[in-house]
Amino acid sequence: MANQDAAQHDENHLIAERRAKLAARRDQAAEAGGSAFPNDFRRDSLAAELQAELGDKDKAELETLDRRASVAGRIMRKRGPFIVIQDVSDQIQLYVDKKGLPAETLDDIKSWDIGDIVAARGPVHKSGKGDLYVMMGEAQLLTKSLRPLPDKYHGLTDTEARYRQRYVDLIMNPESRRVFEVRSRVISGIRRFLVERGFMEVETPMLQQIPGGATARPFVTHHNALDIDMYLRVAPELYLKRLVVGGFERVFEINRNFRNEGLSTRHNPEFTMLEFYWAYADYRDLLDLTEAMIRDVAHEVLGTTTVEYQGARYELGEPFQRLTLRQSILEYGDGLGESDIDTFDGARATCERLGIPVKPSWGLGKLQTEIFEAVAEDKLDRPTFITEYPAEVSPLARRNDTNPHVTDRFEFFVGGRELANGFSELNDAEDQAERFAAQAAEKDAGDLEAMYYDADYVRALEYGMPPTAGEGIGIDRLVMLLTDSPSIRDVLLFPAMRPSAD
């Protein structure tokens, strides 16, 4: 505690010193009738660009080239006459030329602190160690940093502080910046992949009068002008399928969903999903498309289809394993046999042996799904599609033509984590109405995650929706896999957090 108090005292002292420097600078500018921070500097070079262009040149070649550069960035270190600045691409050194710079500029540079954002213009040289630097012929303070950065050797190591102060994390930790650069490229790669295959990107409502498309507890708000309760969407599914009814045969959306549920390493109340719908296709087409898309995006972003995640290696270039839900239970269920899962009494007894609390309303399909989640899901290490989910737990999926107990639905797993959920869509309006009614009854019985009855969506289906396949892929979890990030908070710029004491 004493060490923390001392550190806080030191930080407060540094902040006070910097505020005094800022006040003096403003006073000086006011007396001169100018601005403390003129906005007239224009950068023409990034650190990485200079390294790519000039890094292989020797000192003599650089002297001959007389390459001049205008650079800008945040001061990360000061070492003798050298100042290391960091821009969006990399770091580069500035050299304080005490002989060539005006006295007033040298005095100004003396007041610069680590964390300040500065600019410099001058010729590019190479040090005796082979490092590029810009000889400062001109120098300018662009922004004064009032708070000191964390220790340069330890960075921002407190995990919670990294999440709460992501701006500092991004300054100090190159790996954090890399994660979010990869995330951006993943989303761009998915968008490119789908557009190249004829899918159209659309936007559907975030605020909905009926939150449908997933079994989840929604966030509720109130629209004052309309005087009605509205909900942040839990999924865009029902609106996207309305578009298929309207004639858009291949649509997708990459956007946020909101679910008023718990926080964990896999769950955040707002998260990014890709959802796409494909008319005149079925879930088997989705299996092939999903496998190709994940493989393609991984190779585009990482340059390889081999992914390292938390000490394990996954090969996305090989055919993904495909098992039915029933097959996976029998394969991974530690001795479970057909009699343990194929009848209601057998499945209920199995749940009791496994310590799974059983609700009276559960049917055989729900029992089987709970058994799968208990004995098989976390063992699905290699890339795996699980198919034929029970109709009871798939209220929006089309029943299988030969076995109506199951649906033409799949989920995709890697490392025991679900990344995608897709199925041949239910396009029978009467069947959909019955399933909505069953879900509404569960909601009336106290199930806060059960779906609402959406009469307008049923009406849309009554106009006729072509055979359609649809899928959702969790972007956050996919990025976790591709960046070896153990928590969803590592791949969200600003994850949900409990309010801090300060």
Swiss-Prot record:
Keyword set, alphabetical order: Aminoacyl-tRNA synthetase, ATP-binding, Cytoplasm, Ligase, Magnesium, Metal-binding, Nucleotide-binding, Protein biosynthesis
Residues bound to Mg(2+) 1: E411, E418
Top-level taxon: Bacteria
GO CC terms in record: cytosol
Enzyme Commission number(s) from the entry: 6.1.1.6
Single GO BP term: lysyl-tRNA aminoacylation
Ligand binding (Mg(2+) 2): E418
Gene3D superfamilies: Bira Bifunctional Protein, Domain 2 (3.30.930.10), Nucleic acid-binding proteins (2.40.50.140)
Major enzyme class: ligase
Annotated catalysed reactions: tRNA(Lys) + L-lysine + ATP = L-lysyl-tRNA(Lys) + AMP + diphosphate
UniProt similarity note: Belongs to the class-II aminoacyl-tRNA synthetase family.
Protein name: Lysine--tRNA ligase
Species annotation: Chromohalobacter salexigens (strain ATCC BAA-138 / DSM 3043 / CIP 106854 / NCIMB 13768 / 1H11)
